[in-house]
């Protein structure tokens, strides 16, 4: 499997994402609860161990006290997977500025990379909060980590491409919900439209930094092999992919996905 340098960090071509660990199913509320019931701390650590054994060396995961604690346990027990921190905001009043605290906590906790949450990026872009983009880019650079931005809107990634000096862009194949008013995830009215994917592919082709391809399977709402075919046709040599994996569905899922990535993409 390929290894790509992103801001000086050596990252495996396929990485494991953390949405299933935190119950973000992008399907039904019942499915989300099934994920959190299954992914106890022990099962999260097992998934990370299996990822390492399969050749995955990087975890893209949420910034919260739960994930911080699991990662600390995992590293203390000898785990070596590295962490790109998904920097978020809070739902509470005034919580829209919490990204600064979560970014610093992530750096202090040992992340090697960080990126602003895709919903936050969509919201900043729609609200024209350009100062937040520039400030966050400077803080990530000052923290001596690989820094980037996720996002579901192709327009946001085009703006980032043209206006920020960063290490990577993290491009979603789909834009399931409108985040222009509220940055937080909602499982109401999600859509998985081909037109969004094709527009993002066009922007990806013009981005100069490495791109992290994510939501490649529409969070399990589209055929898996179709997603690998899209990766094959649209990932460049210096790009990687991030995939969440719910191993309750298939205990061999991590190993199988690595094999499929190697067969289709590498």
Where are the model-predicted features located?
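Structured C-terminal cap/extension of enzyme domains
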Residues: 4-13, 31-32, 39-49, 55, ...
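Hydrophobic faces of well-ordered beta-strands that scaffold small-molecule active sites
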Residues: 11-18, 58-61, 81-87, 114-116, ...
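Active-site beta->alpha loop and helix N-cap motifs at the rims of alpha/beta catalytic domains
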Residues: 37-127
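Alpha-helix-loop-beta-strand connector modules within alpha/beta enzyme cores
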Residues: 38-45, 67-91, 131-145, 194-212, ...
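Glycine-enriched alpha-helix->loop->beta-strand junction motifs that scaffold or abut catalytic
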Residues: 78-80, 108-112, 141-143, 162-170, ...
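Active-site glycine- and acidic-residue-rich loops that bind
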Residues: 91-95, 144-157, 190-194, 220-222
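Glycine-rich phosphate-binding active-site loops on the catalytic face of alpha/beta enzymes
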Residues: 118-120, 168-179, 234-250
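Histidine/lysine/aspartate-rich catalytic loop segments that bind and position anionic ligands
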Residues: 160-191, 202
């Amino acid at each position: 499997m390929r290894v790509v340098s992103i801001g000086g960090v050596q990252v495996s071509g396929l990485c494991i994402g953390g949405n299933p660990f935190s119950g973000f199913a992008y399907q039904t509320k019942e499915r989300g609860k099934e994920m959190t019931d299954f992914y106890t701390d022990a099962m999260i650590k097992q998934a990370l161990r299996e990822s390492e054994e399969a050749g995955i060396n990087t975890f893209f995961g949420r910034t919260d006290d739960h994930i911080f604690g699991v990662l600390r346990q995992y590293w203390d027990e000898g785990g070596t997977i590295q962490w790109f921190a998904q920097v978020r905001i809070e739902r509470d009043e005034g919580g829209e500025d919490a990204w600064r605290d979560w970014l610093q906590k992530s750096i202090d906790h040992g992340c090697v990379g960080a990126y602003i949450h895709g919903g936050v990026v969509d919201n900043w872009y729609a609200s024209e909060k350009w100062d937040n983009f520039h400030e966050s880019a400077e803080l990530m650079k000052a923290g001596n980590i690989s820094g980037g931005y996720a996002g579901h809107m192709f327009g946001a990634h085009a703006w980032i491409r043209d206006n920020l000096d960063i290490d990577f862009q993290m491009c979603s194949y789909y834009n399931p919900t409108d985040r222009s008013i509220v940055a937080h995830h909602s499982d109401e009215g999600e859509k998985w439209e081909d037109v969004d994917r094709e527009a993002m592919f066009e922007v990806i082709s013009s981005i100069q930094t490495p791109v992290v391809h994510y939501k490649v399977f529409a969070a399990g709402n589209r055929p898996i092999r179709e997603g690998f075919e899209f990766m094959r046709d649209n990932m460049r040599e210096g790009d990687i992919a991030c995939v969440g994996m719910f191993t309750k569905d298939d205990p061999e899922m991590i190993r199988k996905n690595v094999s499929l990535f190697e067969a289709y993409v590498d």
